[in-house]
Amino acid sequence: MSGHSKWATTKHKKAVIDARRGKMFARLIKNIEVAARVGGGDPAGNPTLYDAIQKAKKSSVPNENIERARKRGAGEEAGGADWQTITYEGYAPNGVAVLIECLTDNRNRAASEVRVAMTRNGGTMADPGSVSYLFSRKSVVTCEKNGLTEDDILAAVLDAGAEEVEDLGDSFEIICEPTDLVAVRTALQDAGIDYDSAEAGFQPSVTVPLNADGAQKVMRLVDALEDSDDVQDVWTNADIPDEILAQIEE
């Protein structure tokens, strides 16, 4: 999970540095709208919606925006788009596998923007299934350390179905099966442990170690993909050492 964990950390820091708050808000709002449409507008009975709302609140999305997105998705307010989820597969430079998850109201536009971003930044598109087999669908819960140890986290979530806990330096990532996400999240709450986010993701079965040059190329490609309003998430199996991450972030 190290490749994903380090990359997720890097993406978060870069998002703040690059002032992409507007794009981040738009993605979080879309997640809420779609979750409400699929599973209903009551967060108490829709764990996916609950988690989408909590993540938006943690990211300082205004409550009014959150509530309007929930209402649009639930059909309580007009204006919701016909969002479609599409996953594209490809390879970044150095043979790094890439999964691109889009949430779009225009399939042709999404496909075009993904293809352009890939080809202009050294990537190649791949046939469905030729890359996704390198990843497993997992759920990821992140929480800040706040004086907690890995043993504290394990004690809280092990019986709830957690598979592993990753130490990211200033936070922990808890990996579990998607079906165990609610149980793990609830176990943390019962133990009085606050969490930052709980969401579905992809865990690579094999990672590709990168040097500084390779890391720069992969990050440039991912940045280009994330510039598209249709792209929700980009997952790679890149393994970028901490010292190289530090160089890139400077």
UniProtKB/Swiss-Prot annotation:
<dbReference type="GO" id="GO:0006355">
    <property type="term" value="P:regulation of DNA-templated transcription"/>
</dbReference>
<protein>
    <recommendedName>
        <fullName>Probable transcriptional regulatory protein MAP_1030</fullName>
    </recommendedName>
</protein>
<dbReference type="GO" id="GO:0003677">
    <property type="term" value="F:DNA binding"/>
</dbReference>
<keyword id="KW-0804">Transcription</keyword>
<dbReference type="Pfam" id="PF01709">
    <property type="entry name" value="Transcrip_reg"/>
</dbReference>
<keyword id="KW-0805">Transcription regulation</keyword>
<dbReference type="InterPro" id="IPR026564">
    <property type="entry name" value="Transcrip_reg_TACO1-like_dom3"/>
</dbReference>
<dbReference type="GO" id="GO:0005829">
    <property type="term" value="C:cytosol"/>
</dbReference>
<dbReference type="InterPro" id="IPR048300">
    <property type="entry name" value="TACO1_YebC-like_2nd/3rd_dom"/>
</dbReference>
<dbReference type="Pfam" id="PF20772">
    <property type="entry name" value="TACO1_YebC_N"/>
</dbReference>
<comment type="similarity">
    <text>Belongs to the TACO1 family.</text>
</comment>
<dbReference type="InterPro" id="IPR017856">
    <property type="entry name" value="Integrase-like_N"/>
</dbReference>
<dbReference type="InterPro" id="IPR049083">
    <property type="entry name" value="TACO1_YebC_N"/>
</dbReference>
<dbReference type="InterPro" id="IPR002876">
    <property type="entry name" value="Transcrip_reg_TACO1-like"/>
</dbReference>
<keyword id="KW-0963">Cytoplasm</keyword>
<keyword id="KW-0238">DNA-binding</keyword>
<dbReference type="InterPro" id="IPR029072">
    <property type="entry name" value="YebC-like"/>
</dbReference>
